[in-house]
């Protein structure tokens, strides 16, 4: 991480072999389309998953006598099963039906773009996830697909009232929020030919994810800001944990759902709340910025790893020991 004002290197975390040795897994980044494609391929290969597109679930009903759940789509068709997993995103229909809690719109806006290798500056072609922390803003870049592309993500505190959602962005807006940063970081916002704009939000963590035979997973359960870079990871952890819970309970759905909730609520709530704090650290201004820089100065890799043990030390073998 660098200071976006003066290029000062605030801290560096080794994510190569030392990271693998400590946590038992590599540190990796992946293109959104590639992870979606990989998950889709894996689901198809099981031969047990059916896909129905252009289908929007609008309501859920449950029958306690038969212990079944019915999902009703936009055409009135009824889909009946033993359980329902609402992995339907931050604006989840399932969560809205059972919890109906409002989003916490942050006022922070994220712009994202992918830049081809040939168009990316040579002096920023680092094989690392790199962050430039500025006052009320920050920039991130990292290689994708073996360095053939680079992801560029910039965040700033909006001057206007925001509505949670995604739209097309404008280069002029981005440039207006990054006037005071150093030239090396500023060149990042001049690269993309087009941007996508996210007005971000999260929700307060909730302690109940299970509603009879219905549950929620991923952003539906714990919508979070991007500051911990763990949204997709937490969704996949949820899925692994639910699968393990079904395995150890011999597919007893009631027991499995209870075990799933017990082992995921605290960890994911910590991600949501930590994300808020990381956003404050990244966007520190004035004296707070100087304090942040001094706190991480000279910190050893072991101290960084110790601080991250709770996050990166998770694996399938301890996923049912988190409650």
Segment roles from a protein language model:
Residues 1-44, 282, 295-298:
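Active-site-adjacent segment of FAD-dependent monooxygenases/related oxidoreductases
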Residues 297-323:
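C-terminal auxiliary extensions adjacent to catalytic cores
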Residues 32, 93-96, 218, 264-268, ...:
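Short, cationic motifs built from Arg/Lys/His that form the positively charged side of catalytic pockets
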Residues 85-86, 111, 141, 194-283:
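Conserved mid-domain beta->alpha element of the FAD-binding
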Residues 16-23, 156-161, 275:
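Short glycine/proline- and charge-enriched loop/turn segments
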Residues 13-14, 97-98, 189, 228, ...:
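Short, flexible helix/strand-to-coil boundary loops that buttress conserved ligand/catalytic motifs
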Residues 6-9, 26-28, 37-193, 206:
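Conserved FAD-binding catalytic core of PHBH/FMO-like flavoproteins
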